[in-house]
Amino acid sequence: MSWIERIKSNITPTRKASIPEGVWTKCDSCGQVLYRAELERNLEVCPKCDHHMRMSARNRLHSLLDEGSLVELGSELEPKDVLKFRDSKKYKDRLASAQKETGEKDALVVMKGTLHGMPVVAAAFEFAFMGGSMGSVVGARFVRAVEQALEDNCPLVCFSASGGARMQEALMSLMQMAKTSAALAKMQERGLPYISVLTDPTMGGVSASFAMLGDLNIAEPKALIGFAGPRVIEQTVREKLPPGFQRSEFLIEKGAIDMIVRRPEMRLKLASILAKLMNLPAPNPDAPREGVVVPPAPDQESEA
């Protein structure tokens, strides 16, 4: 027996530890490997580079509204394939696949509840549902949110994350742009605040309608916001676009949005703004939502 064989015979292999799927994830921006549970506590914000990852509609609403106050609205509304539309796949099959993947019936979730004790109606897009595209049910649920806000005489907040109108519903999808905008006119007539929060991405027919009609238009950092995508624009105008074009930082420089707010600071910022607009006492900044960790912004100078 050679010396190599003698060494190999004395080596006892260790049993490989199995790590359950979903325990770890990687930041899309900096590549840092992150503990999934910690990332969720940080509201899907990377603690290393402050990259704001996409967040599910329900997690967003649960992180915004007071615990125990949430009541879902419009959950009975379901999409129908009235046009029998088919591209490379039947629309009804796309719907079934998206519903199975996300657990949602459509791309918009609406809830009413309280924010620091203040009544509010909130809506959030589920981007994982067909790219957060707007169809008839999305429009109907948004109008339901407006009607509930009018009934309760309270503010409305909408978190947009959408690729635009849903092509599989053709003109019925485009009609939602006018339908939702007309509903918001009633909020304006009543003098009730509507705050639009633009997250990554907010594009197409959604950005061209209710997403940009807020009394305040707030964006998350580095969110892509626009109508057509940058690649489409470059191919059309045959010019190179400026760095950061259509990102929230670019838009605030041009006056297209009102402010940029980090996600961990969004809840208190919205509560403070709405309390002022509704002539209510300011929320207590020393009473953060239970279970939510508010990570500080990374020190950009130290990273450089």
Swiss-Prot record:
It comes from Salmonella typhimurium (strain LT2 / SGSC1412 / ATCC 700720). Acetyl-CoA carboxylase is a heterohexamer composed of biotin carboxyl carrier protein (AccB), biotin carboxylase (AccC) and two subunits each of ACCase subunit alpha (AccA) and ACCase subunit beta (AccD). The keyword ATP-binding applies. The lineage of its organism: Bacteria, Pseudomonadati, Pseudomonadota, Gammaproteobacteria, Enterobacterales. GO terms for molecular function: acetyl-CoA carboxylase activity; ATP binding; carboxyl- or carbamoyltransferase activity; zinc ion binding. It is an enzyme of class 2 (transferase). It is found in: Cytoplasm. Its cofactor is Zn(2+). The keyword Transport does not apply. The gene is accD. This is Acetyl-coenzyme A carboxylase carboxyl transferase subunit beta. It catalyses: N(6)-carboxybiotinyl-L-lysyl-[protein] + acetyl-CoA = N(6)-biotinyl-L-lysyl-[protein] + malonyl-CoA. Keywords: ATP-binding, Cytoplasm, Fatty acid biosynthesis, Fatty acid metabolism, Lipid biosynthesis, Lipid metabolism, Metal-binding, Nucleotide-binding, Transferase, Zinc, Zinc-finger. GO terms for cellular component: acetate CoA-transferase complex. InterPro entries: AcCoA_carboxyl_beta, Acetyl_CoA_COase_Trfase_b_su, ClpP/crotonase-like_dom_sf, COA_CT_N, Znf-ACC.
